[in-house]
């Protein structure tokens, strides 16, 4: 263990630290895929610090989501203050100078987007190791970010992610194509040998793939390694649409169902994006029709139900994280909270890195009782253990994204039981999304132990199932 590390690692974290060291000693990379909240960042910091104390002179490059750049620098300062750390941000000219001087630091940290823009400069450097945090950012091998990441020069490469597979096996291939190109073959051969057979549950393909990747993937879940983590209680709260809201929902549902029914499978595939946009409209009506109809004046059953949960939690002395994938819904909730004199913070993709850090500090210090967060902007990387109530206002296609958001509160450092409320509009597409999440978990479980569905994988029959059977 590095002498200057300012932390005491738990047993499983020591195992992870030693695993990283063993891989690097062999010149190999790997995926640290621990459950959210188990300290992947700390394990990697300990590994980097150990290499520096052993005489490593080349820098480490950490690439992470923009919202986590300052989180990484803060954690490095906290746990390894002896390391020289530089955040590569700011204007292009400033970044160019910082990258050219990367070897003056032990660790340099930047975001995926800036790494993509600056890849030509990074390609001229020589890093001891490259670490991709939230490595699902390169899950699509066709993106510019994925292409750029695979050009980064390094002795070894590591990936940190709680969800190495969110929706399909090709995501795992893309991460391994970054770590150790060729290990899983070409993308085409991987699809033929593993992806298609596993997704269709053919033969022993899942077991063979697990055998192939298991030496390079370390995944622990909280239930297995943290005996003292407080309980997590999950509760689905149904809201019954009534009146004008229900009329709008049924009218739109029937219209979309007729459109899909009259499309052939080939037409559906071509128009899938349009259909998914229509499904989003249905989901917005479930949340609050004002998301789609500016002149809508009637109420929202879900918003009323949500406010009942908020008041009940606050009356009990609890503190709340409230997630929605729709920033417009967070705006509507903000107005309702302000009207009822409830103090709150709001984090979206428009929030600056500095304001994110400030809001997290305020919430953790107990200054504000409610934190509204967009699922995409704040679902990963944040430590918000001051909350013991989590409300998911709307269900996302990929349940893993919701689980990641929940684990902002249910993680190491949490002292209280965490209650998670999933708000669902009864007899609507939302209820069927939940059912589909449950029915499509098996794919990832068979390889790594995870879950998720993808709207991109929807068939015509899936969409009709989402639209069909709604009670009237």
Language-model segments: which ranges?
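ASCE P-loop NTPase motor core, strongest for the SF2 helicase catalytic module
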Residues: 1-202, 210-472
